[in-house]
Regions:
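Gram-negative outer-membrane beta-barrel transporters
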Residues: 442, 554-556, 575-670
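Periplasm-facing N-terminal accessory domains of Gram-negative outer-membrane beta-barrel systems
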Residues: 19-110, 114, 118
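Short strand-turn segments of transmembrane beta-barrel domains in outer membranes
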Residues: 196-198, 206-217, 225-256, 273-277, ...
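Outer membrane beta-barrel strand-and-loop segments of large Gram-negative receptors
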Residues: 385-391, 426-428, 432-436, 527, ...
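Periplasmic N-terminal accessory/gating domains of Gram-negative outer-membrane beta-barrel systems
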Residues: 81, 88-91, 110-216, 226, ...
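C-terminal beta-signal and adjacent terminal beta-strands/loops
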Residues: 664-689, 693-697, 709-717, 721-773
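Transmembrane beta-barrel wall of Gram-negative outer-membrane proteins
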Residues: 248-279, 290-327, 335-357, 394-401, ...
Length: 773
């Protein structure tokens, strides 16, 4: 652990030197007067100088290394009047401000564009997508309201496998390889069984940062991607409520102050409560009687609670609790159910006279899932964790720093039916200790972000060093060349296989015991999964809000662990194979096997929005392969081409009408073809004789894995919204939507013996009403 101590000492020395520099600084938080919410992406500038910054997700800003003297500070944001104040700074002074923006009847679109450009000027955009509530609402809401799961499907590099139990695959990574955070706590199951709904209520979201590759050192423990969700606080000025009903379900929100924020004292306490759920399992047969026999047997309930404390200087404490649940019940076939409960606290503080921002958090979570099938003993999985973290932030004009340390205690338990019907149980405990350092250095046209992560896996006694690097070169004010890369590790394993097109149940393991000890003739002592990323891209900021990006990426998953679908023997023999190891023998006897993976491709994106319209186009060209002990194959989510076109515009009197559309075109997924059918005769017990009076079952002779391709997939989703402003606070909105508007018959699966075909969801009209009070 000497490496962790060294990183901590270095970071604290840097933080100390930053806190006692010889130049003046201005720091603070920006709020809006209506609800007391923080204002991310507000433009903070010193007029007549080059000093400026956009507020971060916490509404925080720091203008550092300023000369002493007089300055005119300006803060601006869309829909608000500019805030201006005159400041006299003394040498070595750190001035703390609480800024409250007042609403304006004049829409200054250039203020938002300026803030967005300031934000983009301070980041490397390689494989990073910032989603705001405005962006999330650009997608037609298939359930009557916008959802994060629907927007993720249009991000280049993300593949979604279907409406019924579909999963998200990010540039060759599987769902278990995606790290999902909610206000700092890890969410292991963020999406419901019905594929277009997440556990997050869009109206509680402040921002979402999606990294599809090459993410920085503060994130780890996963091989593929990061989805970092931040929620807002409750209204700090007045009590509000929001309720919506639609053909799929409902949503309820209540919020307000427990201690009101006032102009004289910004200190406050507020609450935010959210509940959303579904009733489509009950209403589906009545509203959509033309659905096939599988219907929509889904049910979910999500609860979210947050209490936020704000001090007079902007310091913040959040207490958060969640409970998510999901059920998919196919009578006579299977029943999958899971619940996820979590809670904890987060502290954000910037001490007086300090130029750094401190953040700490502690959370506990409990995830439980079960799968019940006829003639098979129930499968269960438990994932329990306790995580604590501490971070130090510094944002300067030419140098920024983020140092953090974390401790995660994880417990997994998985029960399943073994090869002879015996109930098997695996239970593991582990502790993960980690520390990381991210820096950002601006030198001329270059912005360089080196980072390093130390991750210790206690159950493996393994200490991993993971270097990360981002580089941006500004060709001009509008054109940037970007690079991002690094090395990543993961201990968590799922019981799903790359051969499973749909799997509503995932078991979780930390350090599986029943796994190969050799892979392709090489002995493997350490069972940590490993990957490397590299991304090279270019971005262009055009007139107004036009953004164009192009990226080439490669992900080398050079050690992965997959659930073994080839197991046919008990794990009792220790016989070496032809290579002198146990790899081939383990390929047929172990519950888990090693694999290698490779993903590479090209992603293109164009994004353009005006006052009353939006246009978004994303195209992905991707290649994914897997290699196990014996064969190289493509997994079922290897989609070669994927195109998404999204558009929307507002019209009518007061622009109260809104129309949105999304069209998705994708090449066919791989599948394993059938060569023929045969009579499968069972042997009598304890001998090789067959019963001459017994008829065999119908067996399938399979072709090599995933060498066939399904037909092309395409679908159009539409929505039309009308908003009525009833009073200052009261607003009524009606939404009519069409999923799969032209009723494209996209294949879901076919029964190999009866040749019955089941398609993805047909045309589904939806209707929703929402009322804000």
């Amino acid at each position: 652990m000497k490496s962790v101590t060294l990183i901590a000492a270095l970071a604290l020395m840097l933080a100390g030197s930053l806190a006692f520099g010889q130049t003046a600084s201005i720091k603070g938080f920006v709020y809006e007067s209506g609800s007391g919410q923080t204002v991310p992406m507000a433009s903070v500038t010193l007029e007549g100088t080059k000093f400026g910054q956009a507020t971060d997700v916490n509404g925080y800003f720091l203008l550092a290394k300023l000369p002493a003297g007089p300055f005119d500070l300006r803060v601006s944001f869309l829909g608000f009047s500019d805030y201006r104040t005159h400041l006299e700074l003394a040498p070595d002074e750190v001035r703390s401000l609480i800024i409250v923006l007042e609403p304006s009847t004049i829409e200054l679109k250039e203020a938002t564009i300026t803030a967005e450009r300031q934000r983009l000027a301070g980041i490397n955009p390689a494989s990073v997508h910032r989603l705001t509530p405005v962006a999330l609402n650009r997608i037609p809401g298939l359930s009557g309201q916008a959802d994060l799961a629907e927007y993720l499907q249009v991000i280049p590099g993300i593949i979604f496998t279907g409406d019924r139990g579909g999963q998200f695959y990010v540039r060759g990574g599987e769902p278990v390889n995606n790290l999902v955070k909610l206000d700092g706590m890890t969410i292991v199951s963020p999406f419901h069984s019905v594929g277009f709904t997440s556990v997050f209520d869009t109206q509680t979201i402040s921002s979402v940062d999606v990294s599809t590759a090459g993410f920085g050192a503060q994130y780890g423990g996963r091989l593929s991607s990061v989805i970092d969700v931040k929620t807002r606080a409750g209204n700090r000025k007045e009590f509000c409520a929001d309720g919506s009903l639609n053909t799929f379900g409902y949503s309820l929100i209540a919020e307000g102050p427990l201690k009101k924020m006032t102009p004289e004292n910004p200190g406050s306490v507020s609450f935010l409560l959210s509940n959303k759920g579904s009733w489509i399992r009950t209403t589906g047969p009545m509203l959509y009687p033309y659905l096939d026999s599988t219907g929509l047997p889904f049910r979910y309930d999500d609860y979210f609670a947050k209490v936020s404390f704000i001090g007079s200087k902007g310091d913040q404490v959040d207490i958060i609790g969640t409970r998510f649940s999901d059920v998919a019940d196919y009578p006579g076939l299977m029943r999958s159910a899971w619940t996820s409960t979590a809670g904890g606290a987060r502290l954000l503080v910037s001490p007086s006279g300090s130029r750094v921002l401190f953040e700490s958090s502690a959370f506990v979570s409990d995830f439980r899932a079960s799968l019940t099938q006829p003639d098979i003993k129930p499968r269960q999985t438990f994932y329990n964790s306790a995580e604590a973290s501490f971070k130090v932030h510094y944002r300067g004009p030419l140098f920024s720093l983020l140092w953090g340390t974390e401790m995660n205690v994880i417990h997994t338990l998985h029960t399943f039916q073994g090869i002879k019907g015996i109930l098997m149980e695996d239970e593991y405990f582990t502790t993960e200790l980690l520390s990381y350092l991210e820096t950002k250095i601006t030198a001329g046209n270059f912005m360089i972000e080196p980072g390093f992560r130390i991750h210790y896996y206690a159950d493996k006694s393994d200490l991993r060093g993971e270097p990360r690097l981002k580089v941006r070169y500004s060709v001009s004010d509008r054109i940037n060349l970007n690079f991002a890369g690094g090395f990543y590790s993961q201990n968590l394993v799922s019981t799903t296989s790359t051969e499973d097109v749909v799997n509503l149940f995932q078991g979780y393991y930390i350090g599986p015991f029943w796994i190969q000890s050799d892979f392709k003739g090489d002995h493997i002592d350490n069972k940590i999964q490993l990957a490397g990323h590299a991304v090279l891209g270019a971005s262009y900021l055009g007139p107004g809000s036009l953004k164009l990006t192009a990226e080439l990426y490669v992900k080398d998953y050079y050690r992965m662990i997959s659930y073994n679908r080839n197991k046919i023997y008990e794990d009792v023999l220790r016989v070496k194979d032809d290579n002198g190891g146990y790899g081939t023998r383990g390929y047929l006897t172990k519950y888990f096997i090693f694999e290698k993976g490779l993903a590479y491709g090209l992603d293109l994106m164009a994004d353009w929005s005006g006052r009353y319209y939006t246009v978004y186009i994303a195209y992905s060209l991707g290649y994914v392969t897997r290699q196990d002990e014996l064969i190289t194959y493509v997994p079922h989510f290897d989609r070669r081409h994927n195109l998404n076109v999204v558009g929307g515009f507002r019209f009518g009197r007061s622009h109260a009408w809104s129309a949105k559309a999304r069209w998705n075109l994708g090449s066919g997924f791989p599948f394993t073809q059938s060569v023929g059918l045969y009579e499968d005769l069972s042997l009598l017990a304890n001998n090789f004789m067959m019963d001459p009076l017994m008829s065999g079952e119908l067996g399938v002779w399979y072709a090599p894995i995933n060498e066939g391709r399904l037909p092309w997939y395409h679908r159009l989703d539409l929505s039309l919204e009308r908003t009525w402003k009833l009073s200052r606070k009261m607003e009524l909105q009606a939404v009519f939507g069409l999923m799969n508007a032209y009723n494209r018959q996209n294949v879901f699966y076919m029964d190999r013996t009866t040749y019955d075909r089941i398609d993805q969801l047909p045309v589904l009209p939806t209707l929703g009403l929402s009322l804000k009070l």
